From Swiss-Prot:
Keyword terms, alphabetized: DNA-binding, Methyltransferase, Restriction system, S-adenosyl-L-methionine, Transferase
Similarity annotation: Belongs to the class I-like SAM-binding methyltransferase superfamily. C5-methyltransferase family.
GO BP terms, alphabetized: DNA restriction-modification system; methylation; negative regulation of gene expression via chromosomal CpG island methylation
E.C. number: 2.1.1.37
Reactions catalysed: a 2'-deoxycytidine in DNA + S-adenosyl-L-methionine = a 5-methyl-2'-deoxycytidine in DNA + S-adenosyl-L-homocysteine + H(+)
Protein name: Type II methyltransferase M.SinI
Pfam family, one: DNA_methylase
Length: 461
């Protein structure tokens, strides 16, 4: 029996073995007898005692409509490093049901709670055991998880000069993600990451400590060390591993955005490459890439949320047309416009860049007005707006992105495009159900060479 007549959300969460977020949602829905004092929910203990009679978390969730109403035969997924849930939405469009999300960023958590108030949401993956995660997801003993997906950050492997290798694996969220996934042993594991994962060393040696007359790089300092390490762990658990660097434009996304997708299968058989739905010039009989014009022209009569360019930058944008960048300025203005950056190496194609109408968008970044990665509207004197980001990333119109303006840009700029997630989900379901997966020999999945498991490891993976 609970001693106090009124208890807090935290106390109720502990008694019910639910997350505080879940308890607050139940308060809002009237599933628990509670009232608000200011911004704080106060809960009648008698209501909690009734809930405590329910034997399991799963039963409690069902009793109070805390589970989504999708059919129970959908394959089940758990999501980590969920962000704004771009990967999740694509996977769900393929036919999966996401039971749990994990995110530490406050704005992204608010986005998840706003759109999926009934979904289990946890914070830092390192704060939970496998048992905690399964319980919060409502997975009862004997029930399988079909898919675990996420994009763990790989920076932890190679923080310049300050990391201790992998002596403290508990502090590494990438390692924790693998530990959780391999402990749960779903049918499939998906790892999404940036291109840098393919070349990231286990330990970074500063550039001023390399070169002629200095000791050669150790094995853990060699490019690709992180990838080799990940694959070794996954394969030792009996999973197959296949991966490639995929340009999202090849999957119906109006954006040139390349991401590494690693797919691991518990049955040990290699999952083929994703099946493209589009190609740059219509190769393989596929439709051509979707352009920016096709994507954002219907957004003209809405209110756009966007950051502003500095006035001194607008001076140059007034001289540039769609698809142009700093090199299209008169020669006498190029040095003036770029300042010290003019003398840097590389093409500097992100400086003073107006995106083109009849191409997919360049990769959306977390801030469209940073000098080296400008994303200016093709015609207007402004960066691309949050609303334009959202449709380029293919989020549904009803999907709410929470937070301040820069929070929204960050969430959308970090998201996996829905079309790429859909391609991943379809491939996994086809493999799971024994359906033939069409191959596209010599298809150019990205702008780079030697980016797949077959390129790097041959048939051994």
């Amino acid at each position: 029996m609970i001693m106090n007549d009124i208890i807090t959300v935290t106390e109720a969460a502990q008694l019910l073995e639910l997350t505080p977020q879940r308890v607050r949602t139940m308060c809002k829905q009237g599933s628990i007898d509670a009232y608000q004092s200011g911004r704080t929910w106060l809960i009648k203990s008698s209501s909690v005692e009734k809930l405590m009679l329910v034997n399991s978390l799963s039963d409690a969730q069902n009793s109070y409509s805390m589970l989504a109403s999708e059919p129970k035969n959908k394959p089940k997924a758990l999501s980590f490093f969920s962000g704004a849930m771009g990967l999740d939405l694509g996977i769900e469009q393929a036919g999966f049901e996401t039971l749990l999300a994990s995110e530490i960023d406050k704005a992204a958590r608010d986005t998840i709670l706003s759109n999926r108030p009934n979904m289990a949401l946890i914070g830092d993956i390192r704060d939970y055991t496998t048992e905690d995660i399964l319980k919060l997801a409502g997975v009862s003993s004997g029930n399988e998880i079909d898919l675990i997906m996420g994009g763990p950050p790989c920076q932890a492997f190679s923080t310049a000069g300050k990391r201790l290798g992998l002596e403290d694996e508990r502090g590494n969220v990438f390692i924790k993600y693998l530990d959780v996934a391999l402990d749960i042993r779903p049918k499939y594991i998906v790892i999404e990451n940036v291109r840098g994962l393919l070349s990231a060393p286990m330990k970074h040696r500063p550039h001023n400590e390399r070169g002629e007359g200095l000791p050669p790089l150790k094995s853990e300092e060699q490019p690709g060390g992180v990838l080799h390490y990940i694959i070794r762990i996954i394969k030792s658990a009996g999973y197959s591993v296949s991966f490639n660097l995929y340009n999202s434009a090849n999957f119906g996304v109006p954006q040139i955005r390349e991401r590494v997708i690693i797919i691991c299968s518990r049955d040990g058989s290699r999952v083929p490459f994703l099946q493209p739905t589009h190609s740059e010039k219509g190769e393989y009989g596929l439709p051509k890439w979707i352009t920016l014009r096709e994507t954002i022209t219907n957004l003209k009569n809405i209110t756009h949320e966007h950051v502003l360019f500095p006035e001194k930058r607008l001076k140059y944008y007034r001289l540039l047309k769609e698809g142009q960048y700093w090199k299209h300025l008169p020669e006498d203005l190029q040095k003036e416009a770029l300042g010290k950056s003019f003398f840097l190496g590389g093409g500097k194609t992100g400086f003073l860049r107006r995106v083109a109408w009849d191409r997919p968008s360049p990769t959306l970044v977390t801030h469209p007005a940073m000098p080296a990665t400008d994303l200016a509207h093709p015609d207007e004197l402004r960066p691309l707006s949050v609303q334009e980001y959202k449709v380029i990333q293919q989020f549904p119109e009803e999907w709410v992105i929470k937070g301040k303006l820069l929070d929204k840009y960050r969430q959308l700029g970090n998201a996996v495009p829905i079309g790429l997630g859909l391609a991943v989900g379809k491939n996994i379901l086809d493999h799971m159900n024994g359906r033939k997966i069409e191959s596209f020999p010599n298809f150019r999945y990205s702008r780079y060479k030697n980016t797949s498991d077959l390129d790097i490891f041959g048939e051994l993976v």
